[in-house]
Amino acid sequence: REKIGVMFGCFNYSTRVQLADGTTEKIGKIVNNKMDVEVLSYDPVADQVVPRKVVNWFNNGPAEQFLQFTVEKSGGNGRSQFAATPNHLIRTPAGWSEAGDLIAGDRVMASEPHRLSDQQFQVVLGSLMGDGNLSPNRRDRNGVRFRMGHGAKQGDYLQWKTDLLANIAHSAHENAKGARFVDFTPLPELAELQRAVYLGDGKKFLSEEYLKALTPLALAIWYMDDGGFTVRSKGLQQRTEGGSGRIEICVEAMSVGSRDRLRDYLRDTHGLDVRLRHAGAAGKAMLVFTTAASAKFQEIVAPYMAPSMEYKLLPRFRGQGTVAPQFVEPTERLVPARILDIHVKPHTRSMNRFDIEVEGNHNYFVDGVMVHNSPETTTGGKALKFYASVRIDVRRIETLKDGTDAVGNRTRAKIVKNKVSPP
């Protein structure tokens, strides 16, 4: 006896497929007209969204039902929408998952434009350690809003940072005290960073991976934002030639564990002798550098300092700033996007199921969401008389914390298939 081949799920006629030229087309029209088009597809080797040819077209007849998905996205009306059969495979951060196994609140992988250059990402990393912040988009859109703010005396410095991000849409405003703020358009590429840094306890959480990603530019921005420099000697005597001083940087906004990790990172990676102390009546956490470590740190960051902030450098390190804006063209990259709603789509005039086969990568995008090139059919072969198939769906419900440290996850397990029968 032969096993029958299995064909996976399909889409409703109106589901829009993203074409390589940036437009979209209904999958039903692509199939019915056997349109010779290129679609966007994810290449896992290159980690890029690339154009790929459609090489086969499928109209698989009527479906019993379609599940209508609504997923957050950054552009347009803030919604991605498509209708799939429950067995269609959709990409999630954990791998492929059947549409029927997903619930609202789960995340799927979507293609979103990435606008930040490597240099600009470092500006964000450094600012987050200092006076910058990331706030989630409260309108159920994908992407988070980056904000920088400084007092009236630091207007030139804020403008210097804004110029480094000038190609990102932004708005500026001033409060009654003269402090200035710059808000940038929500960026989907920063959503994961926001989730990693803000764990809900009001303090910023900096992981080992965050610290390893820092370049001297990010360290310079952190220092310019929150650092203070006290001159100990102006270098008038021969033994103090070049001057000396001591850096202190406020780390009160960081979690206790993050302060320790940052201190250890500066010691181990840059060989800087730094220690933590609590200053003043308020007991604010400060990172204190020795005079030798202060000079060494200033040597590292000097080429990345803003002209208006050179007073925080010893005279011998001034005038070295060489930072110029580096912009890049937007590229499509994968980011997690939250499912806002799933419901059974009401019956329509056409309940036919449509699918396409894509050259090479076997995936494509429907209204931005990555889905499997499903008419991969299993080839069949000799069947077992009986077989068992059990699948357990394990989901993370919440993160368990000990103080500020994540120590585990609370999970929910559900048997989603349990079958013992002749095929």
Swiss-Prot record:
Pfam families: LAGLIDADG_2, RecA. Belongs to the RecA family. Transmembrane segments: none annotated. Gene3D superfamilies: Hedgehog/Intein (Hint) domain, Homing endonucleases, P-loop containing nucleotide triphosphate hydrolases. InterPro entries: DNA_recomb/repair_RecA (IPR013765), DNA_recomb/repair_RecA_CS (IPR020584), Hint_dom_C (IPR003586), Hint_dom_N (IPR003587), Hint_dom_sf (IPR036844), Homing_endonucl (IPR027434), INTEIN (IPR006142), Intein_C (IPR030934). Keywords: ATP-binding, Autocatalytic cleavage, Cytoplasm, DNA damage, DNA recombination, DNA repair, DNA-binding, Nucleotide-binding, Protein splicing, SOS response. This is Protein RecA.
